[in-house]
Regions:
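Metallocarboxypeptidase
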Residues: 1-217, 224-225, 229-234, 257-283
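A structural signal for short secondary-structure junctions
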Residues: 40, 111-115, 218-222, 246-248, ...
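Residue-level recognition of well-ordered beta-strand positions that form the cores
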Residues: 122, 229-231, 255, 300-302, ...
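Short, contiguous acidic/charged loop-to-helix segments that flank catalytic cores in large enzymes
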Residues: 186, 242-244, 288-291
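Non-catalytic terminal regions with compositionally biased, polar/charged low complexity
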Residues: 223, 235-237, 320-322
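Short amphipathic, basic-aromatic surface patches that mediate peripheral association
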Residues: 230-245
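Extended low-complexity, serine/threonine- and proline-enriched intrinsically disordered segments
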Residues: 243-261
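Low-complexity, intrinsically disordered segments enriched in Ser/Thr together with acidic residues
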Residues: 284-324
Length: 324
């Protein structure tokens, strides 16, 4: 099973059915892993499976629950709840809690291993047959009716007698093996479009940074204080909690480019209470561990001189933005 081959929480086949030789022993998975490792700007990922009508997130095992903090869960929830609206009949679920324990899964490697917000979409759901939930009623003929009235019996092979060399007289027939696992043709385009729309919505909420405000204050004696506020206009932070905790990616850097002398670089934690932290080394470029989704970070510099300047933020996942 390619989805039991990823290098997080991997277990051998006698524990996790479907596991192969070792993590990333399948060349296709290894190629994806190597691509992701070479592209630290990747902030979001989705993979498509079948079937079940689900939008899944990790963790696959209960032991990894603590890899997700409340802020990350809030991001996952907000995006996936919109997915439930965009794709009727799909349910947002957590693998270990709502399905079963799964080890070596793609979801876990992307998020826990790389700090990337990731979903798996389980394509196709019986809800799409008649736009209503299924039941466990043994007399519910929804599947039969769907084949009869909408597929014109294309999914069902009539039973017929067959002379089996070992078992003698038997009957063969019934529903085709792909029925219930993949979309009938006329429903494929619609569901593919809706899943694509959800993927684009997910992508839209990857970090987008801008310098929202720059202001100056004269301190006298040729000194001035320059304060810059960097805003993230999307739901995802520049670093997930797993990323920050394990220092997976480098910090975001906010730099003042000027010929004036930069005497101090300071991160503002609470402007109202005047709580700040000075960066002792290289004050011109302030390293911040994370810029929160739909939030801001404020920094300031003490500068000697009156030269022009440009403020730039450089983030692996949030891109580059500047203001003069």
């Amino acid at each position: 099973d390619p989805n039991r081959d990823w290098g997080w929480g991997w277990q051998p086949n006698y524990i996790q059915n479907g596991a192969y030789k070792y993590p990333f022993s399948l060349p296709e998975n290894r190629a994806i892993m190597e691509f992701v490792m070479k592209h630290p700007n990747i902030a979001a990922a989705q993979s498509y499976h079948n079937a079940g009508g689900m939008i899944l997130r990790g963790p696959g095992g209960q032991e990894d629950v603590n890899t997700y903090n409340a802020q990350d869960v809030a991001v996952y929830d907000a995006i996936a709840k919109k997915g439930e609206e965009l794709i009727p009949g799909y349910k947002y679920l957590v693998v270990y809690k709502d399905l079963y324990s799964a080890y070596g899964g793609e979801l876990d490697w992307f998020y826990a291993g790389r700090g990337i917000y990731t979903y798996s979409n389980e394509l196709w759901t019986p809800y799409l047959m008649f736009m209503r939930e299924g039941t466990r009623d043994p007399f519910d003929n929804k599947t039969y009716d769907f084949d009869r009235y909408l597929l014109f019996q294309d999914a069902f092979v009539p039973w017929k007698e067959y002379d089996h060399p070992q078992y003698g007289k038997i009957e063969v027939g019934g529903f085709k093996k792909n029925f219930g696992r993949a979309h009938p043709g006329f429903l494929l385009e619609s569901d593919a479009h809706r899943n694509m729309a959800f993927t684009i919505y997910h992508c839209y909420h990857t970090p987008k940074l801008k310098i929202s405000e720059v202001k100056e204050r004269d301190l006298g004696d040729g000194l001035k204080e320059i304060t810059a506020t960097v805003a993230n206009e999307r739901l995802m932070p520049t670093h997930s909690s797993q990323d920050v905790k394990n220092k997976i990616e480098v910090p975001d850097y906010i730099t003042i480019n000027t010929t004036a002398k930069v005497l101090a670089g300071i991160q503002v934690e609470n402007a109202d209470l005047n709580q700040t932290t000075e960066q002792k080394n290289n004050p011109q470029t302030i390293a911040v561990p994370n810029i929160p989704g739909l939030g801001t970070i404020t920094v300031k510099w003490i500068v000697q001189g009156n030269a022009p300047y440009t403020v730039t933020v450089n983030s692996k996942k949030g891109g580059v933005a500047s203001s003069k």
